[in-house]
Every structure is written in C-alpha cells, then in structure tokens.
Amino acid sequence: MSRFADIVLPLAQPAYTFAVPEGMTLAEGQAVLVQFGANRYYTGIVWRLHDRRPDFRRIKPVLRPLYGVQLLGEEQRRFWEWVASYYMCSLGEVMRVALPALMKPSGSSEEEFAAGEFRPRSETWFSLREEFRSEERLHELFEKLGRRAPRQYEALLEIVAALLPDPQNAAGIPASDNALATTAACSDATCSDVVPEAAGTPSDTAPMAADAVSTPTSGDPSESFSDDTIGEGASAPASDASIAASCDAEALLAAPLPPEALAGAIPRRLLATERPVLHQLERKGVIRAEERERQPGAAQDVRFRLPTLSPAQGRCLTQIRELFASRTGVLLHGVTGSGKTEIYIHLIAETLRRGDDVLLLVPEIALTAQLVERMERIFGSRVTVYHSRLTERARTETYLRLCRSEGGEFVVGARSALFLPLRRLRLVVVDEEHDTSYKQSDPAPRYNARDCAVVAASLFGGHVLLGSATPSLETWLNAARGKYGKVVLGERYGEARPPRIVISDTLRAVKRGERKAHFNKQLLDAIGERLDRGEQVMLFQNRRGFSPYVECPECGWTARCPNCNVTLIYHRGGSSERLVCHYCGHTEAVPVKCPACRVTDLAPRGFGTEKVEEEIARLFPRARVARLDRDSVTSERAFRSIVAGFARHDTDILVGTQMISKGFDFEGVSLVGILNADNLVNSPDFRAAERAFQLMTQVAGRAGRRAVPGEVIIQTSDPASPVIRQVAASDYEAMARQQLAERHTFFYPPYARLVALTLRHRDPELLHRGARALAEALRSRFGRRVLGPMTPPVDRIRGEYLAGVLLKVESGASFTRAREVLREVLDAFAAGEEFRRINLQCDVDPQ
C-alpha cells in the first residue's frame, strides 16, 4: 500500500504531499479532506500515490476520503495536466474551474468544513411489495381496485407499466419517464430511423443514501385488502380516465408479467399520480416507499427518432465517418441554414448506440435554447444540460452522477462542460467553433474550449467535429494543411435559399436626404414592405444602451467612470435614465446640468439598441417591437419570453446585439438590417475583419430560412470595404485568403503563437516600472519576439491601472520550450521584492 499521496488543492499552488494513514485505501483521482497550514481544511484531489518520503520532518495525514467515488480517471488527469501546462497555470487553478463550488468546501476547522460539505438529496422510490409480484395476485388486486378505488387502480397501473421493459409493454403504455415524449415529431425535418435503446429499469441495487429507509406498514398486507377496507371514501362514477385505464389494464395483464421486472423500483418524479393516492397504496401494503440518493438526469429507457437527411447531408455524413477513420478532428464547414444539426444528431445517435459518451459544446446555453430543445425532443432523458447558470447543487449532482456512469451519456453544455467526468468520451461536437465565447478570460486557466476539445478527444481515443458557417482562420488553415479533415455543406436545407445581401451607402443617403434617424430610406422601405406582407424583421446593432456617451455641446464635457478610464454609457429604460459603466458596473444619475459649464442641454451621442428600439417604434407605430440584449434579458425566463414571443409572431421587429445571431431559426424572418457595419470592421484588432465577416454572416443567416426569400441590408459609410464586399458575396474563402496573407506578412496567428501578459496595480508609476522591467527581461531571452510594454485602450479598470507585454512565438519554434523559458522569467519577476505586489496575468492564445 502506498504511504504518501500528492494532493492537488484548489489554490494557485503546486501539489503537496500528505501521508496516507494505515488502513486507509485511496485511489488516484479521488477527493479527500486535508488540513493545509495551521487552520485551513480543504478538499483535495489525490494526484499521485507513492512511497517516496518528502524531505521534511512532519507530514500531515489525509483525514478522510470524500464522496465515495473516483472523481477523475486517468484520461481526465492527463487532460488537466495538459491544460495546466499549456495555459501556464497550476493544477489547483484547473481544479477551481473544473469542479462545482459545492465540491470544494473549505473551513478553519473540520466542523466548519463539514457544515459546508455537499450532501446528496434523497428522493422516494416506489416498488411493489413481494406479495404482489405475481400475475395472479396482480389480477386479483386490479379487480378489487377497479371496483372500489379507481384512483388507486390508475396509480397501480402506472407503476406496473413503468416497471415493465418496453418490449413487454403490450398495452403501449410509455415506460419510465413516459418516454419523455421523445417520439415527438422532429422540428423541421421528417423523422425516420427509430433507434430503440436497450431497455432497463431502475433496480433495487441503485445507489442509496446512507440513511435510506423503508416505510413500514402494520399488519398483514394481504389482510388489509378486504372489500370493506379498499374504498377511497364516498363512491363516485368511474371517470373517463379510469375507463381508459381499465382498457389499458386488460391489455397489460393479458401480456406476460416477468417477476424480475416487477421486482424493480420507480422514482417518484417519474410518476404522474398524486402523492396522497400513492400514500394510500403504501399504507395498505401494496407498494413500498424508500429513500434513495437522488440521481438527477440519469438516462431512462428512451427511443429516439432521427431526422431524414437530404442527399447533400447524407454525403457529408458519409465523408465524416470516413475521415474519422484516419483523423481525430473534422471541420464541417456548412453555410447558415444548411442543416449541420441534423448531421450532429446522426453522429450522436451512433455514438450513444455503442454505449459511449457524447459532449456537444455550444457557445452559450441561453443563446442556443432552440438547439438544446431540439436535442431534448430527439434524445429525451439522455440529454444532460450543464452550464454555469445552473444551481451549484444541480451542477454537483450532475458531476457525481456522471462519476458513477458506465457510459451512454449525452451532455450539452458551455465550455465548462469539458471538465465533466465522461469516462467513455468518444465524440465531441463543437457547434459554432469560431465563437469567442469558447475562450475564458478570467480566472485562470484562460483556456479555449475548442482547442481543449481537440486535445480531450485525442486523449480519450475519440473524435471531435468542429462545425461552423464561418470557421476561425486557425481551424480553416489546419484543415487546409490536412491536420483536420474537411467536409463542406454548401447548400441550405429544404426549400430555403441564401438571402440576397445588399450594401446601402450611408454617406450617399445623407447627401440625398434619404435618411431618417439611423436608417437609410432603402432599409425603411424594405421594413415597410415586410410588415405589409406580415413578415418579420431583425435589426442588428452591436452596441447596447441608448448612447455610448452624453456630451455637453458647449464645452465638450463627457461623463466618465470614477473607477475605469471609460465614458459612461447612457441607458434609458422606460421612464428612468442612468449612466452605467460596462466594465465595473458603476451607475449614476444623468446630471441635470453640465458639471463644467452648467449648460443644461446635455446631448446623447451615437446610438445603441435602446435608441434603435425607440426610433423604429416611432417610425412604425403599428409594429410590435422587442429588444434582445444583455439589458433586456435580466433572467433566463425573460430571454425565453422574448424569443418565444418572436417565434409565435407576437413581435414584428426584433432589435438586438450579437445575441440575435446565435442559433436562432425563425421561419417568419425575411429581412435583416445591419445598422452600422463600420464599427465592426474598424475595431483596433488584427482579428477585426475576420470577426466582422463572421458576425455579419451569422446575422445575415437568420433571414429566409424557409420558403420565404430573405434579404439583408448592410448600412455602411465604406461600401468599398473588402470585408463588407466579401460578406455581400458570401465569399468566405476570399476573406480567408486575404486575411491569412496579411497575417503571414505581419507575423500573427495562425503563423505565430501569442502570449499576452497583463500587469495590474493601483500605483501607475510602479506598474509602468514593472512593465518596462518585465519587457526587458523577456527581450534578453526572446529578442525581437517581445512587443511592449503597451498601454491598452482602457488602461484603468476597477481602480487598477493596466499595462501589457506581448510575446510572439513563430509556429515553427518549440512552443513548449518557449513556455518553459517564459515561466522562468515570470517566476523571477514575481520573486523580486520591488514588483512582487504587481498582479501579473498570463493569457496563452489571447482572443
């Protein structure tokens, strides 16, 4: 038995060695309670077990194991190690991101730790008592209940039907979870290829809580069911439901009732029967109730129907299968509306059929609600949704359930789902792989979920499918070089055709007097035509709020944040007016007078979504207008309400930021207006053109997704802009070739790796001295590969001043060695007395 364990703690520290007490059995990847320092108690992960005694006198012992299950398998530990190494952070920082908060309690004593320790919820499971697990006794019982207690009759019928495996369910009664309506029609595609999954009923061997109990009943159960005691009270005529249930019972009891199935149990949450009726059956000794540890989201018996593929989709699916035989990763480059999701569904079904796990990554769960709902309609209770907006208890229960799973799991999640314990992970699908939401900015590790998905799939011996209509240039070049396979789906699904894209010259409209508010006449006329035909419109302005700032027309004063070096955004929601900082959240009232010169008519400058909403409602007073941005979506319920209202055609015009570009499929939208393309193209970022193309193409793709032709109008003061013309021509490859040529010339990704170093401190002089010292230390090792120090456009946030240093490493050099040298320089910088108080952040592959 190993005597020592290297334990990873949720700290920005290396692993520490603890002693394993005699008689305690531990496994690598298991969670344990340890004391760290004089009075801190933490959850730790056993990383290595060994017999090498450390070179210090007193070694603290592991206090006790936690959770009773291994949290991390070998592949997952290797994945954590890769993340920590590549993104230059500690395993403890990976642990902080990977595990739900309730799995990382801490305290100043064991008692305080125990008070915050996660305790699984229990739930009630029902089973037939042994006396009624035969056909003869069930026939007799149904006959008695049918005469005197129709509600108990229906409850027992539901329990028996739920216990039976589907092939034995001759009555056609849905099995567990009522089949979750998983055989419902599939969205916008014809359903075929019904795939039945192996039936299985919850058994008495399911994990139970330590305090699991059986509810006792008094007396002999067989005696409690005389005709005198079975009634439910005053007699009543049988309801339609009970008559239907009687027919179901006849069919059910006409089929064989295997005793092994009747010996199973069913959780309360899967029964529609009211609790008082179940209690009556329990009290009279027909059923038994026991408390078990809740296993949320566990896959029940399901059968799912797969959408019929078009010939083009079928060819793509075949190509992907063939490429998976020789490559880990494949890029599915499909135009908007081409039906990439249908291909995902077929690959997911094939993987689940083999008993393997699937992970579908989406940029943001809330913004891809339609995709999640589609998957739930197809795969039913197999779908587990995981993201940061779930309660910590729900996230923890899901994590622990997956630790016990033997495979066949399907998780749909945002980037954090990458760290779930899917032991048989064989397929990762990254939808909208280009999306910047896959990159974590804070805290460390500052990882890109797309890149991590490729590594995870390789470590688990699986495959990754990267899907996008506008792939990132890194992914596109990897496919062009043969690192990834590439499959192109170049036509829209069904009758839908690509939208017509029109460039509208804003400067010309102003000169001709053909502009009202922030709309060219060309766009206003198109909106009027769509409204007259009963069609819907989406208007895109990638700036929330009413105006970017307010200004004094007399002296030029603008309101600025006291904590950050930015102007305050003017918001005007309903009757309230306020100035808000979008960096730190500072809010203040709009001044009545200019603080500098006392002029009273302060003027909003520029426009955001709130102003667009107000102006379009004034120009089209009969139109029903809604807004979708971070300010209007105060909760998931508000988001779903806005989206559902637009889908029902309760809204004619939807105004929004980039939130309207992600994953939506509204059949009534025939016009999309992009109100200000210039602020996308002219951003001071080497990726500006690529991102402008991606965003405008994704927004444009919302138009004309059914038989109704779509049109997109792009308002710009620079109609000759290459990227805007490339969007209008839907020419991704022209954009890619041009941008890659420029990046090759100036030595930017994907022809170089970047590491961005950000220094923060409240003393600007100390900060800039430290930034200069760090840049010089890096130049002594990396030479001209170092840029900076630089002052970012926003150089003060939350009271801290910022400075930056950028390291470029050519793609042909060893990035592993570069990180090793960089770590040496950073450690030496942090150890120095003068600059140790400077907060230094390291971002590998910054976005």
Q: What are the roles of these predicted feature ranges?
A:
Residues 1-468, 480-496, 781, 806, ...:
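Accessory, non-ATPase domains that flank or precede helicase/AAA+ motor cores in DNA-metabolism machines
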Residues 304-310, 314, 326-409, 413-768, ...:
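Inter-lobe coupling/hinge segments of SF2-like helicase ATPases
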Residues 271-272, 621, 708, 782:
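Proline-centered flexible-loop/turn and helix-kink motifs
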Residues 620-623, 778-786, 831-835:
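Short secondary-structure junctions
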Residues 48-50, 99, 291-293, 541-543, ...:
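A general secondary-structure junction signal
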Residues 763-764, 808-814:
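Helix N-cap motif at beta-to-alpha junctions
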